[in-house]
Regions:
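Local sequence-structure signature of Cys/Sec-based thiol-disulfide redox active-site neighborhoods
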Residues: 3-48
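Basic/polar N-terminal segments that are highly enriched at the extreme N-terminus
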Residues: 1-6, 114-117
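Non-catalytic, surface beta->alpha helical segment in thiol-disulfide oxidoreductase systems
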Residues: 87-114
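Thioredoxin-like thiol-disulfide oxidoreductase module
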Residues: 55-79
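Amphipathic alpha-helical interface surfaces
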Residues: 34-37, 41, 66, 70, ...
Length: 117
């Protein structure tokens, strides 16, 4: 799918992370199982040939500005909107990480999970 405004091909999955202590978020003294599950989901999708990119606000702020819908959500709800999961250019989940099943449904069936804005 090509973005009509930018002319760029949409990535399969983009994850816009809240501020984390490191790129994976797995660097603190307490292990966050949600982030472990996310890491496993990303590995699974990539093994299936999907392109998955995570954007951290501190490391890649331009990504948050380039995506108009993501930028608008952050302006409206600030950091409470994060994390945001985008599948093929469409927001499919906010406030929590999408599960592997939710991302697969959005990718394979073209359906958007009910929790989308």
């Amino acid at each position: 799918m090509t973005d009509p405004v930018t002319g760029l091909t949409a990535l399969d999955v983009e994850i816009f992370d809240p501020p984390l202590c490191c790129p994976t978020g797995l660097c603190g003294p307490v292990l966050d199982t949600t982030l472990v599950d996310l890491g496993e989901a990303i590995i699974s999708l990539q093994a299936a040939g999907r392109t998955v990119v995570r954007h951290m606000m501190t490391a890649d702020p331009q990504a948050f500005l380039r995506n108009r819908e993501v930028y608008q959500l952050i302006r409206e709800r600030q950091l409470a909107a994060l994390p945001i999961t985008v599948v093929r250019g469409q927001i499919v989940k906010t406030d929590a990480y999408a599960t592997l099943d939710e991302m697969r449904v959005a990718l394979e069936a073209g359906l958007v999970p009910a929790s989308a804005p």
